[in-house]
């Protein structure tokens, strides 16, 4: 019945369409090029869609596209994916045309390959620049994998409720309606949605027209929306639901309409999103000096969503856990993530929506700026969160994935849908954001801000390339009194068009000299690999005689050369130590001569607070990674790390935790591993006493993150008090599940309780997981369940990844394996065997377009042995023909990282063992034991005083 109604209406809209038999014309496309030929472009779309969430098989639609040929042509080429074309009509769009009502349509071919090209032929040659309108009616399947238009579900009062929503970025607008699905081909969109009357919340990018609600078709209500501004097709969004909302209508802190839609009964959890979202938009408008363009910016929390969120212009869609805050359930980490994601998506309203990329080769023009501003703009609203301090930790994390030869550059040419999706990786996000932060500092913050304001105003509603950005910045630099050594495009082309990053080695030219000798090499985790890639590197430094970490402007530049460069440094001869790269604002590592490393270790162990906390984090991260790479003796890194027993700030400890996690992986099972564990317990003892399991009233925002690091180290590495306390807390929680257990420590407590293999603990937590509808609680539980050491329960958990009746949402299934991979060697090896055996079934069940890369990237951080290398080779050979571009890149990174770890064992294991045995073995046991007692007593006393 509904299908007949839809088809009847399509006939009325299209006039007298030519009926087609799809089987006779669905031909294999012969285009070698995935990019549209560019011989025509759209200016206007009128899209009508029929959505019924209860009829989950398919939906119908019609689209009328105003098309302008660039040249005289007899065909146009656009995109359509996984749909049946029902009819096509084409006619002249010029009132002066004598044949205005003539149907120009002749035939069409629809590619069955992944080009998704729809070629439409006409009865005559179309004149250049003379517009026509092409009307297409079609039937399409709801997307099975949350990319396109799809159905999501939730349970309310025991009944399943369905809704329709969408995710069209990057290449899935073509799955919603035939269109020119490339970001540069912008147009105005008019949308009409037909939906059953029971679905009271029907939304798209623009508000409803004043006379929009009409019941002109039985069983459907017609919702007509205002025309958009010129925009890309991937930014469209749809929602047909029974949601409720809160809004800023009665108490606005921002002058545009904002609503937050979510499941009925969850409106109280949307208050933070509404409040922070408005304040964040105000700050972004101030910063960019450019007003938000649409009349509304609504936010939607949906139960099933592939990404964390999507910046659709005017209707931003989020996964529930990325938007809703439940007091007593949402962790501090999740709350911070919500703030970051809201800021990220708000930023896209300028970087991506107002100014979009010319093609997905330049994904970073969207995602790099959104990554930078997700911290920077959050910091403008909530400075107490210390987001720009935490940014350095995120940069250090991306160093790991950027330190392999196979990594792609920031600007990376892509053509196929698989390649395009693969560009949405850590390079486009975290690396690009880090390079943008470096640019902010070497330009100065005010020149950077003015440059972005000029870029946005100049490129508004246009498709941009990096040259457009660089030219705007250069114009502002030229008008200022600030100078840089080269033109900006020369500097930035090396950072954006080459993969990887440098390690800058700095030495005194002589013991009493006033100059540095500086060289650069590409930093690669595998020390057996080499590269001649070089960069234009901004340099600044601090001397022990002039400790000023605040001025981060360049004091010199390192040219793009392998040869050594001499840099004059007045006063160097009087300095006991020096540090290059203030606040780690430059995207590079720094190595020194052994004498300077020893001097830095001394000052850290004596008076560490004289060094900026971000540079303390830098010294920890650089030293251990340089040692891992074979460029620094591990004994120097360990000597420096001793100071951590005095370190109270979270940021250096986050850097240290990453270094220690790698060492734990490569040392696990070795005879020296117990000594390494002893060292970690020694370093964390004062903080374990100070932080414990209980949160203090009014503690700093980042303290829960710090507490989790300390508790995880202690419970994992044998602190009996930590293990017994965690087990007691879990048992008390089981005995009284309604009691309050700080959500910030729940994953640690649950994980510790599961490591013992207790089946009852697992069953209790699994029952809670399946019973709760709260996405925050589900995340906590799923991340803990992977810690189980019970093989039977682990196998059951893994089965949920591929089971047809899985109780884990598709978007979360990859977390089952990731949590197991991260929990320890036994579960990691079990997960590897499971993936090796079942990857073909895993792909379509874990949000296959991105979930598998999350799993593979977790392996890239943890696999270390020759046995692992053999299994990955087997895995690669077995599934090579089904890998996506992103999966292939992840597998290549795994292989490089394993090779580096095998090299590590031959080059570094003996040095690490010698240092640990000297300091924590039989030879040093009595001295260390006495030192531990004295230091811990002193530190606890100091902490209690402070």
UniProtKB/Swiss-Prot annotation:
Regarding protein family, the annotation reads: Belongs to the peptidase M1 family.
- Recorded GO CC terms: cytoplasm; extracellular space; plasma membrane; side of membrane
- State the protein's name: Aminopeptidase N
Name of the gene encoding the protein in the UniProt record: APN1
Task: Output the GO biological process annotations, alphabetical, semicolon-separated.
Answer: peptide catabolic process; proteolysis
Provide the active-site residues from the annotation. 345
Q: Where is this site: Transition state stabilizer?
A: 429
- Disulfide bond residue pairs: 715-722, 751-787
Q: Which residues are glycosylated?
A: 60, 550, 605
